[in-house]
Every structure is written in C-alpha cells, then in structure tokens.
Amino acid sequence: RGLGDVYKRQSYKKLMKAYYAKQDTEKLTAKQDTVQKSTLMGSSADSLKVAADKLNDSELFDKDDDTIVKAVKSFIESYNDVVSESGESNNKSVLRNAAWLTGMTGKNAKLLSKAGITIAKGNKLELDEDTLKKADKSTLKSIFNGYNSFAGNVSRKASAISNASKGAGSSYTSKGTYYSKTAASIASGKIDKEV
C-alpha cells in the first residue's frame, strides 16, 4: 500500500462525510419547512375561525355599514389565506378539509352574491362593497348567523384545518423522520385493550 492509497481513503472518507452531512441538512430543512408551513396554516385557519365567528354574531348586523364591511373584508382575507396556504400543504387532512371548504363555498355562491361576495380565480373570494352595503340585513343574517349558516360551517371547517395542520407539524422528529403517536403507543403497549 502506497501513500496514494492513504490519500484516496482519506479523500473518500471526507467525501462521504460531506455527502451525509448534506443529506442530514436537507432532511432538517425539509422538516423545518413542513413545520413552518403547518404553523402558518394553523395560524391562518385560526384567524379564519375568529373572522367567521365574528360574522356569526347577530349583533354585528345591527351596527353601521363600515363595521360590517370591515368584518366581511377580514373574513375574506382570512379565507383567501387559508385557500392559498392549503394548496401548498402535503397534509391529506388539511387538503380534504380545504376541498370541502371551497366546495361548500361554491354551493353557496348564489347566496353569497347577495352579500357582494363572489368566487374568483383560484377559489378565492372577492367583495363588492356597494352590494354588501345595499344588502338587506335579514339576508346577511341568514347567510352568516346560526350554526348551519355559511359562517358557522366555515368556522367549524377552519377549526378542523387548524387541528389537522397542528398534527402535521408534530408528525416529524428532530431528525426529520416520521413519527406516529398511534404507532408509538402500539410499540410501547399503551393502547387500551377495551373497545
């Protein structure tokens, strides 16, 4: 064995060490991106729930037009954020709930148009303030007030999206490997045997 072989082995070791360090960094970066997206998605879904609950408050529509417009604009902004961010999600539960949300919104398009809300490109909502201001208050209450109202349904779906996104952020370990609480419970024998 010559000096050349020693250099080759050392070079190979350095190369492999650099390769695996890069792989670890990429896994960590991917995990951090997933956690960041999940955190942002959860925050946006929480904001949507708050905005939908505000619209579901029957006293809102007894207030002046500017207050109502502000609440509807806030709702639309939060809704559009959730639609945009859910489109970038890899979480099946987030995607399923977001698809239900946009589908339900589509089914209510005619009713929403009475409040000046239309569905635009990419399933995002747009507002015609003049139509909203001219809308009958009882029509607005029928759209936004009550458990089964549009706002009530959006509020519940926003909660589901938020919960799903929070689950996504915690499903990866610090090393970037998938972690399942159910699998961990089975492995540790902590699942109840009762049905």
What annotation goes with each model-predicted range?
Residues 1, 5-195:
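Polar, low-complexity export/assembly segments characteristic of proteins
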